[in-house]
Amino acid sequence: GYFAFEVVKDAARDLSEGRIPAGIPDSILENVKMDREVNGDLWKADLGRVERGKGWANLFDIDVELVRVNGQVWTMQAPSGRFFEKNMRADVTNPRGTMTEGALLFHYRAPAASWEQKTNYLVFPKGFEASGDLGAFEAGYMTLIPGGIMEADKGATVKWFDREEKTQ
């Protein structure tokens, strides 16, 4: 009881003096849309809500489209994430989406994903699953490298489906 009272009292003092305590957002934005080019890739993001603090932002209702230089189009939806300004990194929870390249379409999902501007890599550190008409792919750890290259680690499985053409 006493400890909680002191924490609240300190936070109230900081706010009354115009200082925002660490971990508390200083601004909240809703329905944020961003377009950005990073190393030739085009990123479009729609964010339902952004809670911004000093050097960080909590992200909610994330919807991203990434058009890679090689023509691949990745979409990603995630319920929440966090952006860190110091190292220009974003982490998201439970991303899911699609990857298209020409007529090829795969749906994917993962427990987590992270992206760093310095490398422009999209990393799925807790596993990755994808499936489409051609087959299915699972990895314990997956990195999407610019150019559309996927590197799988910690065990990977690929299943190709038989696509026999049937004529009548």
Describe the residue ranges of each PLM region.
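Mature-chain termini and adjacent capping regions
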Residues: G1-Q168
